[in-house]
């Protein structure tokens, strides 16, 4: 049984890519030829085997990867320019780069399946395909998937921008405001903060320390009051005793307080709180 497919493109790089990939095509019994006309280059694949479904499946997957390599960047760029035209050129570039890095493995598999299924269904009833037209009119679900990725990345970009503005404002405030404490110790354990003064006595989060003007839309949940207290006290040195791993809150403190921050993981204070954690975990296992 003979099955013929003709792929039409006016992009030289696409035709070269397709011909090269077909040299290593996994399906036997195919003959490939290429003809250049005034508008399009036609890449023609003749299949003389018996397993038409396998042939269509493999050629559809090959074309799906081709679409991702050659069309996806411009589709993403067009979606950004159309839906988010009010961002600056530099901001659009940042959003575009975010999109490229945020298409994870799961999303990639989903996208490949969407495109290959569209080609598979199309080739059951058609012998030739114009790639530009196919992308514009037959891959609506694919473009919708990319639109979702762009929306997600725009939201992430806005949140990151607000976060960076927040950090910059606080850094400027710290640099222009006198310190109210020589040193503060912050014990960071189970994503919660305990503040100690220079004598290692506990600092209470009371109304005297809390100044609402330092509160921000950027929230660290239970650590908001710790951050506010630090912004009120403005220590010359901030010793962070990491009982657990460093997370976003600690990274933010390092950005805000800069060279005032000293990370510690092995002092007597660290050992004390680590031993308390170990005893707690041991008691939980016994119970």
Tell me the role of every PLM-derived stretch.
Residues 1-224:
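Conserved mixed alpha/beta catalytic, RNA-binding, or beta-rich assembly cores of soluble enzyme
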Residues 199-287:
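C-terminal structured domains
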């Amino acid at each position: 049984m003979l099955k013929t497919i003709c792929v039409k493109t006016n992009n030289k790089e696409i035709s070269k890519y397709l011909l090269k990939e077909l040299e290593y095509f996994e399906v036997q019994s195919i003959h490939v030829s290429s003809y250049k006309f005034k508008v399009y280059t036609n890449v023609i694949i003749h299949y003389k085997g018996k397993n038409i479904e396998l042939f269509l499946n493999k050629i559809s997957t090959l074309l799906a990867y081709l679409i991702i390599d050659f069309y996806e960047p411009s589709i993403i760029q067009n979606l950004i320019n159309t839906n988010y035209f009010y961002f600056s050129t530099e901001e659009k570039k940042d959003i575009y780069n975010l999109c490229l890095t945020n298409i994870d493995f799961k999303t990639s598999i989903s996208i490949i399946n969407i495109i290959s299924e569209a080609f598979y269904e199309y080739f059951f009833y058609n012998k030739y395909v114009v790639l530009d037209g196919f992308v514009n009119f037959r891959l609506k679900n694919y473009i919708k998937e990319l639109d979702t990725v762009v929306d997600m990345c725009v939201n992430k970009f806005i949140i990151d921008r607000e976060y960076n503005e927040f950090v910059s404002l606080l850094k400027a405030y710290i640099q222009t405001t006198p310190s109210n404490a020589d040193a503060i110790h912050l014990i960071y354990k189970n994503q919660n903060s305990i503040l100690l003064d220079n004598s290692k006595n506990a600092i209470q989060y009371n109304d005297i320390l809390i100044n609402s003007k330092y509160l921000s839309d950027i929230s660290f949940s239970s650590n908001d009051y710790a951050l506010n207290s630090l912004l009120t006290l403005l220590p010359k040195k901030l010793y962070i005793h990491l009982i657990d791993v460093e997370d976003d809150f600690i990274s933010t403190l390092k950005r805000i307080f800069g060279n005032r921050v000293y990370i510690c993981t092995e002092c007597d204070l660290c050992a004390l709180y680590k031993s308390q954690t170990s005893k707690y975990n041991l008691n939980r296992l016994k119970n």
